[in-house]
Amino acid sequence: MQKAWGFLSDPKNLKTITPDYMGFDILSGANRKMFAGQIIQYILTPILGIPFRWVTEITHVEKGHYFVDEQRFGPYTFWHHKHFIEEIPNGVQMTDIVDYKLPLGFLGRFAHWLFVKNKVKSIFEYREQKLESIFGKYE
């Protein structure tokens, strides 16, 4: 449990569990272990190599159990991401709950239907595979 929490609560490891095609780089704020109020700035190129700046704030941390990040500036109108980590028999389970909304009204809803929903899903599937390769798969 401590090993998993140590990895997941270190912002520098986010690049490790993000697909390369996202062009993800941390610009600032990842030089300390996670804490409530921490601001982390990123740049990523998820669509056609177009760079997006993304600023998130870690709003809640309960060491060893969960943390929450919220977008302060970036591609979404709203982004609220809860990461729960719990010890289970013979392992650790991580659960992500993400609520988000795209800008631009109908166009945003259309983009979500057309590709964003599947892109977000594929990113979290990639993370699951990476975490399994790092920590092992729970059977």
Annotated model-derived regions:
Residues 71-122:
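Beta-strand/loop substructures that line and gate deep hydrophobic ligand-binding cavities in soluble
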Residues 17, 97, 133-137:
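Amphipathic, soluble alpha-helical interaction motifs
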Residues 1, 33, 59-66, 84-93:
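A short, structured loop/turn motif at beta-sheet edges
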Residues 17, 49-51, 78:
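A cross-taxa feature marking solvent-exposed loop/turn segments within ectodomains of secreted
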Residues 25-73, 126-139:
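Glycine-rich portal/gate segments that line the openings of hydrophobic small-molecule binding cavities
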Residues 1-35:
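Hydrophobic ligand-binding cavity/cleft-lining segments
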